[in-house]
Design a protein with these regions (language model features):
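Short glycine/threonine-rich catalytic loop with a Thr-x-Gly-x-Asp
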Residues: 108
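Nucleotide and nucleotide-moiety/phosphate-recognizing core
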Residues: 2-105, 116-130, 137-142, 149, ...
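Hydrophobic alpha-helical segments within soluble ligand-binding/sensing domains
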Residues: 111-114
Length: 192
């Protein structure tokens, strides 16, 4: 089984923000593969099903970003998945421009509080991360305001393509392994 957790904040006011792009990918996968997110557990909205023959648990932690590790840690411990190969975290990344995707199999939190929480709760940093570029804050701007803001109307078609490509990247990770998916998606610049 794969646990696929998209990071975000649960309040409706955060829908469509840069920080919630992980939730958006989970919604996309749920819709594409007919996996209802109608269950709750592990402090998350959940959906269980299959993606091209692979059993998955889709998660949208409802803990707020900074406590995401509570939800992810509970699910990993319950299902006893191998966090190095069967846990996929989908996150926003301010160090990548919109249209860029990067897959990592380990590393620091890079200033991302949701990832920091997951590392703390798992007791290690070796898990697959699918990082989606949301762009850095404007010069002189506040980082929190930036990640909690929506994308510009001009950028929305690009973000829809990024979400579709992120869904394909998740499938590639499950079918071909993280290394092969990294070779395919890292460095790819998505455009409309």
């Amino acid at each position: 089984m794969y646990i696929i957790a998209g990071l975000g904040n649960p309040d409706r006011k955060y829908a469509g923000t840069r920080h919630n792009i992980g939730f958006d990918v989970i919604t996309y996968l749920s819709d594409k593969y007919g996996i209802s997110l109608s269950k709750t557990g592990f402090k998350s909205k959940l959906g269980q099903g299959f993606i091209e023959g692979k059993k998955v648990l889709l998660m949208k932690p409802q803990t707020y970003m900074n406590l995401s590790g509570e939800a992810v840690g509970e699910a990993v411990n319950f299902y006893k998945v191998d966090e190095t190969t069967e846990l996929i975290i989908i996150q926003d990344d301010i160090d990548l421009e919109p249209g860029n995707i990067r897959i990592r199999v380990k590393g620091s939190a890079g200033g991302h509080n949701g990832i920091k929480s997951i590392i703390s709760h798992l007791g290690g940093n070796e898990f697959i991360r699918l990082k989606l570029g949301v762009g850095g804050k404007p010069e002189g701007g506040d980082l929190a305001d930036h990640v909690l803001s929506g994308f510009d109307r001009d950028t929305e078609p690009l973000i829809r393509k990024v979400i579709e490509n992120a869904g394909a990247a998740v499938l590639a990770i499950m079918k071909e392994g993280a290394e092969a998916a990294m070779n395919k998606y890292n460095g790819m610049k998505i455009s409309v």
